[in-house]
Design a protein with these regions (language model features):
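Bateman/CBS regulatory modules and CBS-like beta-alpha motifs in cytosolic regions of diverse proteins
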Residues: 1-21
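Short, charge-rich, low-complexity interaction segments located
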Residues: 20, 27-45
Length: 45
């Protein structure tokens, strides 16, 4: 599953997001100024 979050939201919740990405193999698309800028995925993916 993939979730899209703004960079400011990722900054505020980074530890929680890393736990979720690692444990549930979720992908997080990070946006900057409303445009996709990066993806956070687990090391195993």
């Amino acid at each position: 599953m993939s979730e899209t979050l703004s960079l400011s939201s990722v900054k505020a919740h980074l530890s929680e997001l890393v736990d979720r990405v690692e444990g549930e193999h979720e992908r997080v698309v990070v946006t900057r100024n409303g445009r996709p800028a990066a993806v956070i995925i687990s090391h195993e993916d």
